[in-house]
Each structure stands twice: as structure tokens, then as C-alpha cells.
């Protein structure tokens, strides 16, 4: 393998000079800097400067690097362990275990993190719904098995909590394989998630990859590809349906932006890298379903300053089948999950996919919530007394629907001391249909807040001293 030496170090960016006339390492190749007999760091070739100089990005801290240090070409891109043995383990961007478990032997199957997306004739689409057990998602923006989902929201509105609940519900109910990729998020959250999954017994069906906030931008740029490579193996070789969770895709963009100027690129809109769309496309086009197996991807997307026109979230929108938008005003009202039922969308909300009854109930819910939003302006200026009887009924039912869209989470039980609930789609449809048809008009609004199926509402109302008068509600309570 060819050898070079360091000629310049600028933060995470390292320039390496190789002898002119010899074969230069390819773009995306991994280079190894030998710091001492038992210490080395990995660089990745990003671009060629001319005169045998390659500009590289470090996957680890560049502390201790100096000019003149020897650099070896590994001859290939960064490669990470793949296969069933990765389940139950935690890795860094280089595929090295960071959970204190045994190292993988040199002859263990590995795969390079840079690959081409599957060809067009290999792709397939699914029309099967992935049940999540979260009412607002299953009813209004159902997720497709093998689809791509984005959880959009500003800081502190609950993106990571929803991702953790989805991992819990899907692992418990669907018995599937998951890959969780932490991209530039808090180390504490990754630590909590690891021990939570260990305690609930789902860790042995999950591979975890972390490149957290404190790591160099090179690691945060590439860690999403590491997680995706592990997921691709289960799809392409094992022929399985895999769930890929990425938290947070914005940090992937942010890391690229951090090194873009150091690489000599002129910034684009809002200071982002000019290659933003290309980088996002290279990642997203690989996250897809083929005739061999599927990858269902659920990605948290941080929205800077709650501005959805920011180039980072706006670029992500184009690749998604469903979007779950989290709204700060709902957090302020104490409605969790704080999913905006009118702004969230899904291509699967189609009578041919979800069935006519589900579609009808969902559109009726959206209609009544939209009408309530329009009436709020009148209410804020003139008060409820100026509304007609029909409008008052719409407001009353809309508020019950809004509260019933909230739900207690299993992963939040440790904070709230209230048990979580998993609600099957059939139960969700039944509950909202009863509210829409007026069977629960005499129950207090608070009975609908933070509950699971509609039976929980009736039990909560009883505890509040209210017995339903509607025959259908009474019959359900007696069951």
C-alpha cells in the first residue's frame, strides 16, 4: 500500500502528501495515521488538491497529529462488521464495539460504508401498514412497511421520545430486527436508550451505532452510513425486513456544513454546504426496499428555530412517504405526543391501502379539527357565546378528539408514573368513530387526556363520578 505524510492539519481536516507518480488512494478510501505502536487514527479521503496532496477528514480527534507523520493507504473505504453477530452490540462510526464487549475477529464479514444505491429494477414498493400502537400516527399519518418517515420538530418537542416509543412498540409487538443510529445527538440519550432496551429484552434484536455530539464532524457525517450498511446486510443477504432509526438526520447535514468551508467550498443558502442535496440524496436513495427485503426508515429531523423552510429539513421532505410534524403549541397545552394532526401527512392514507372505514374516520377527524381551528379566531375575539349550537358541538367534539389523540408512552413511564399503552388500529378507529358520532358527548374533556383505547376514557370518567348516558357507551363499559 502507498505511504504519504501529513503536510497540514486544520481542525478535523488533514492534508496528506503522496509521492507524485505513484498510485494515489481513491476518493473515500480510509487512510491510517500511525501515532505510536498501539495508537492510530483513521482519515477518509475527500478530495484531491493536486501535486499529490489529498484533503482528508478525520474520524477521530486530531489531537497529537503533526506535520511529517506517516500515513498508510488501507486500500479500501471504511468497512464495518455486518451480520447477526452485530445484534445486541453498540458500535462507533468505524465499526469498533464501544459497549465493552469482545472485539470482532479480523476474518469477520465486513462491508464498506460507501455503496451505490440499488438499481431501479431491484426496487419494490409495499402497500402494507406498519402498526405503531400510537393513535395519532396510526389514524392520521399511517406508516408504510418499507417506507420512509420523518419526525419533524424544533428543540424539545419530543422527537427522540417518539423514536424510543416506536422502537419499544415495534420490537415488542412485531418481533423485527432494528438498527438504531445516533447521529450527533446527546450521549446521555444513547446511554439511556441502551439500558432501557437491555431491561426490556429487545436489545438482542437491535444493532446500535453512535456518533454523538462530542465527536468530530467526520464521525457525525459518516455514522449514518455505518448504521445503514449494517441494515443493508440484513435486507440484501438475510432477506429480512429491517427497521432503521436515525436520530437526528439534521446533525448529518450540520456535520457536512462544519467541514465544508474547511474543504474550500463556497457556502450555499443559509451557510449550508453547496453539496447538501447530493449528500442527502446519496444517503436517502440507499434507504429503500428491494425484492430481497425491506428497510423501513424512521428519521428524526430537527427544525432550526421551527422554520420548515430551512434548507436542511426542506431537502429531507422530498424523500419521505410520511411526515409527522411536532408542534410546540401542543407541548404548551400538555398534549403528548405533540403531533400536529393537520400538518402531518402520509401517502398511505388512501382507502385502497388503509380501507374505507379508516379513511372515512380519519378525514372526518381532520375536517372537524380544521373547522375548530377556523373557529378559534372567533372564540378568541368574541367568546363561545357567539357561536351557533352546531359550532359549539363541533368545538366540544374537536377538543375531545384533540385530547384523545394524546397518549401515555411506555418510555415516559419512568417520568410520569403512568403506564404506557399500545392501541391497535381497530381500537383507534372504534374510539374516534364513537366521539365523532356523539356517543361520548356527555363525558368530561379531561377523561380523554393521556389515555389508551376508548375503554380507558369510560373508566376515567367513572372515577371522576360521571356515568355515560349513551346506550353504546354503557354497553362498552359493561363489557
UniProtKB/Swiss-Prot annotation:
Catalytic reactions on record: ATP + H2O + 4 H(+)(in) = ADP + phosphate + 5 H(+)(out)
Record flagged with keyword Lyase: no
Keywords from the UniProt entry: ATP synthesis, ATP-binding, Cell membrane, CF(1), Hydrogen ion transport, Ion transport, Membrane, Nucleotide-binding, Translocase, Transport
EC number: 7.1.2.2
MF terms in GO: ATP binding; ATP hydrolysis activity; proton-transporting ATP synthase activity, rotational mechanism
Known role: Produces ATP from ADP in the presence of a proton gradient across the membrane. The catalytic sites are hosted primarily by the beta subunits.
Similarity annotation: Belongs to the ATPase alpha/beta chains family.
Protein name: ATP synthase subunit beta
Amino acid at each position: 500500500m502507498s505511504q504519504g505524510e501529513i503536510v497540514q492539519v486544520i481542525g478535523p481536516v488533514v492534508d496528506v502528501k503522496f509521492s507524485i507518480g505513484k498510485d494515489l488512494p481513491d476518493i473515500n478510501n480510509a487512510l491510517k495515521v500511525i501515532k505510536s505502536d498501539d495508537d492510530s487514527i483513521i482519515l477518509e479521503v475527500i478530495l484531491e488538491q493536486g501535486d499529490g496532496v489529498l484533503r482528508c477528514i478525520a474520524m477521530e480527534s486530531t489531537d497529537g497529529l503533526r506535520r511529517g507523520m506517516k500515513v498508510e493507504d488501507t486500500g479500501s473505504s471504511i468497512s464495518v462488521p455486518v451480520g447477526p453477530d452485530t445484534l445486541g452490540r453498540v458500535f462507533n462510526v468505524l465499526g469498533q464495539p464501544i459497549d465493552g464487549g469482545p472485539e470482532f475477529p479480523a476474518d469477520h464479514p465486513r462491508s464498506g460504508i460507501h455503496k451505490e444505491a440499488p438499481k431501479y429494477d431491484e426496487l419494490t414498493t409495499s402497500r402494507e401498514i406498519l402498526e405503531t400502537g400510537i393513535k395519532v400516527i396510526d389514524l392520521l399519518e399511517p406508516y408504510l412497511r418499507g417506507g420512509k418517515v420523518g419526525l419533524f420538530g424544533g428543540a424539545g418537542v419530543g422527537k427522540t421520545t417518539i423514536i424510543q416509543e416506536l422502537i419499544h412498540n415495534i420490537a415488542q409487538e412485531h418481533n423485527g430486527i432494528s438498527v438504531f443510529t445516533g447521529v450527533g445527538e446527546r450521549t446521555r440519550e444513547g446511554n439511556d436508550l441502551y439500558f432501557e432496551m437491555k431491561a426490556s429484552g429487545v436489545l438482542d434484536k437491535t444493532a446500535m451505532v453512535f456518533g454523538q455530539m462530542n465527536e468530530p464532524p467526520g464521525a457525525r457525517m459518516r455514522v449514518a452510513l455505518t448504521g445503514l450498511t449494517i441494515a443493508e446486510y440484513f435486507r440484501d443477504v438475510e432477506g429480512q425486513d429491517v427497521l432503521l432509526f436515525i436520530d437526528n438526520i439534521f446533525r448529518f447535514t450540520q456535520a457536512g456544513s462544519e467541514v465544508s468551508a474547511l474543504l474550500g467550498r463556497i457556502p450555499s443558502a443559509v451557510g449550508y454546504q453547496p453539496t447538501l442535496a447530493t449528500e442527502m440524496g446519496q444517503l436517502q436513495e440507499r434507504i429503500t426496499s428491494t425484492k430481497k427485503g425491506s428497510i423501513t426508515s424512521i428519521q428524526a429531523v430537527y427544525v432550526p428555530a421551527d422554520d420548515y423552510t430551512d434548507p436542511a429539513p426542506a431537502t429531507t421532505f422530498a424523500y419521505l412517504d410520511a411526515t409527522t410534524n411536532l408542534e410546540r403549541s401542543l407541548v404548551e397545552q400538555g398534549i403528548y405526543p405533540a403531533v400536529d394532526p393537520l400538518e402531518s401527512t402520509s401517502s398511505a392514507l388512501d382507502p385502497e391501502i388503509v380501507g374505507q372505514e379508516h379513511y372515512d374516520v380519519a378525514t372526518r377527524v381532520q375536517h372537524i379539527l380544521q373547522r375548530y381551528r377556523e373557529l378559534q379566531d372567533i372564540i378568541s375575539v368574541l367568546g363561545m357565546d357567539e357561536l351557533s349550537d352546531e359550532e359549539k358541538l363541533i368545538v366540544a367534539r374537536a377538543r375531545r378528539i384533540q385530547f384523545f389523540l394524546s397518549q401515555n408512552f411506555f418510555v415516559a413511564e419512568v417520568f410520569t408514573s403512568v403506564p404506557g399503552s399500545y392501541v391497535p388500529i381497530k381500537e383507534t378507529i372504534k374510539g374516534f368513530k364513537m366521539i365523532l358520532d356523539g356517543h361520548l358527548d356527555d363525558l368530561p374533556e379531561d377523561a380523554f387526556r393521556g389515555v389508551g383505547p376508548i375503554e380507558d376514557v369510560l373508566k376515567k370518567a367513572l372515577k371522576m363520578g360521571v356515568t355515560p348516558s349513551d346506550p353504546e357507551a354503557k354497553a362498552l363499559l359493561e363489557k
